[in-house]
Amino acid sequence: MRRIGAITALSLPVLLSLLYSCGTGGSASKEEILSKKEHNPEPNIPLECYTDTGVVKLGKAIANPCYVCHTKALTPYENEVDDFDLQLVYDFPEEIKEMGNPWLNAIKPELTIGSVPMPSDEEIKTWIRQDNWSKAYAEKGKGELVYFPDIPPIYKYENGSYELINVDKEGFVRDPETGEYTGWRVFKWKPFPGFFPTNGRIDSTFIRLPEKFRKKNGEFDLNLYKKNLAILECAMKGVAPGETCSGTEVGDFIMPFRYEGDASDVEVVVYQYPPGTEFAHPLYYLDPENTLSFKSLRIKEMRYMKKLAYADTRTGTGEEEEEEGTFFWDKGRFFNDSGYWEMRAFIEDKNGYLRPQSPEESKFCIACHGGIGGTVDGTFTLWRKIPGEEGWKEQDYKNIKDYRYKAITCENLDSLEMGEEVKKALEAYCSKVGESPGEYTVYFALTAGGDHFRSNYEILQDISVDGKVDLELLYNPEKIKFIDNSGFIKPELFFPEPERAYGIDKQYYRIVKAQAFIYGRDVFEKAFGISSGGNSLEELDNLESTGVKESGIWNFVKNFLSSE
């Protein structure tokens, strides 16, 4: 019998029937439907999608965090979809409507992790400074870790301090034994709105192109590899063959129609990674003592993607549902919904060692990489890379500008597809500043906070001079506090205070010890459901409109960023 804390083999349906059976009516029919599934039937719908915009608690929407993911498709390929309608309606499957919000770690954590004691400060510091990456790296290709990626750890912790290892000054990852180039390269990108360390999201991102992209006449050529990476970066940012690719580490050049060197047989396709492109994506705990990046030695997860083929252009809506029973899984290896990416995912076991994610846990990854409007080729990263040499280094959350949306300029506001309240606020901003606002400025204003859940009160003091965050940020841009006099985002925006950082670590540690990932990976200081005073929806059966259309805060523009 599987145990989650002191709860003996209680499946998600049973837990939810207990939660929602008192005074709600219809509990028998819910239980009948839920008994058909052991756990969450739709783990690919993340907790963010269960956020109350205000329409439930206040009777009207005051926030629209949905627009950053669900919008006009950024590209014409099958990897993305026009799903902007999901800003307007809560479109949950019937089974989810019947069962209610399945992410119990957010709304009822006492049922899932309540029996796991909160670790002390010293216990959590000891935990996060232990190395579980090296062990997994040493065992790659064997047993349960047969698909673990061949990328070595990049930090060590000795004598009370952190040091970056196995990464050179240009971001190339070196073999820890031979010092040779592995092909992996770390890069820095503007974090996706809300996915900040202060919200519990901290990571590194690595890319590797196939061997022939690194060779000329069969010999390794570092300068050639840099050029091919620059070509790819510009292609992902929308620069077509024949146009000028500018601001790269190798200078400005005319975009070729094919990659160079031994990869000259591979066509350059705008908005598409060439087949064989790999990504590695470790997720960390927060450690304020790491002054390099705030990242812990221990990693929570290792995620991996490999491109299989160039994607076809969309011919339908792109939202056709995957047939039941077609999900492939083998020791943490699986494929995203479009089938153009192989994915792998590893997460901590209760002792902190990395193990393959289960099929249900793996489907959680497809939530964001399975085909939404706000990605490019199913990813969030390289098209958001910091330009030039500054972008080829480990993510340190420094020297990042609040790059603007290409689609929003002061000259084209009348033609944009967005609500009247948003448009009026942007007009006010333009009239005062003379240029359109940055991406984060728009996000904070539309989200009425610094995260999708409106749960992080600490960040509000870093965003605004008076701690109030809403559309007034656009009407009164002098309230903006998170940008310095040189136009860069102040690093303190991204980081929580040490006490809160370790508090986030502690709550996640409890999920690890309970092995309760199927109930969610986001952590809050206390239960965050509507009934507990939070903003996570609980019951869904009578919910339709998000209210953002009625409140005039919808936004259907593509979220590509400018480089200025």
Swiss-Prot record:
It comes from Aquifex aeolicus (strain VF5). The keyword Lipoprotein applies. This is Uncharacterized lipoprotein aq_1262. It is a lipid-anchor. Residues 1-21 form the signal peptide. A lipid is attached at C22 (S-diacylglycerol cysteine). GO terms for cellular component: plasma membrane. It is found in: Cell membrane. PROSITE patterns: PROKAR_LIPOPROTEIN (PS51257).
